[in-house]
Amino acid sequence: MSSRILYVDDEDDIREVAAMALELDPDLEVRTCASGAEALAAAAEWQPALILLDVMMPGMDGPTTLGRLRERPETDDIPVVFITARTQAQEVEGFKALGAKGVIAKPFDPMTLAAQVRGYLKP
C-alpha cells in the first residue's frame, strides 16, 4: 500500500522536481499544491499520510497553513514537515513548537528526498 504525500510550494520548478523525485519511489503517491489555501482543501479531501509544506509562500505562509490544518478535525492529526532554507536550531525548534514533525532543508537533494520522507513516515 502506498503512502500519500502532499507537497506544497509556490515555486513551480521546485514543486515539479520534488514531485518527480518522490514519484520514483513506488511506495509514495504524490499530489502537489501551489498555495496554503489549495493545501487545506487537498488535505481535507485526500487525507495524505504526510504534508511537505514550504514555509515562505505568498498569501498564507507555511506556519499559518499548519495552524489552519490543526484547527480542522479532518486534518488536525496529519503530520507536517516544513521545507525551508531557515534551518538554524532556534528556527527549527520554533517550527516544531508550532506542531511540525520536522524540517527538510531547502535546497534539498532530489535523490535523497524520498528517503527523508520515508524516515518521517515511520511510526
Regions found by a protein language model. Give the residues of each.
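Short, glycine/charged-rich "phosphate-handling" switch motifs in NTP-dependent
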Residues: 101
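Receiver (REC) domain active-site loop signature in two-component systems and cognate sites
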Residues: 57
